[in-house]
From Swiss-Prot:
HAMAP family: UPF0291. This is UPF0291 protein CLM_2971. Belongs to the UPF0291 family. Keywords: Cytoplasm. InterPro entries: DUF896. Its main location: cytoplasm. It comes from the Bacteria. It holds the Pfam family DUF896. GO terms for cellular component: cytoplasm. The lineage of its organism: Bacteria, Bacillati, Bacillota, Clostridia, Eubacteriales. It is found in: Cytoplasm. The keyword Cytoplasm applies.
Length: 62
């Protein structure tokens, strides 16, 4: 599932839970989708951090 559809479904289930409640199956789906979203975000952050290089500070003499 692409990120946009994933977020739309998560938001839909959240709104439904507040308005009328969720079935047991929908609660399971909501948890699964949230876990998938978190895993994607974690993966993106990991890739970003792996691409970071430390740049040494220049030596300054007064």
């Amino acid at each position: 599932m692409d990120m946009k559809k994933l977020i739309e479904r998560i938001n839909f289930l959240y709104k439904k839970s507040k308005e009328e409640g969720l079935t047991k199956e929908e609660k399971v789906e909501q948890q699964k989708l949230r876990r998938e979203y978190i895993d994607i975000i974690k993966g993106n952050v990991k890739v970003q951090l792996e691409g970071v290089e430390k740049i040494p500070k220049p030596n300054r003499k007064n």
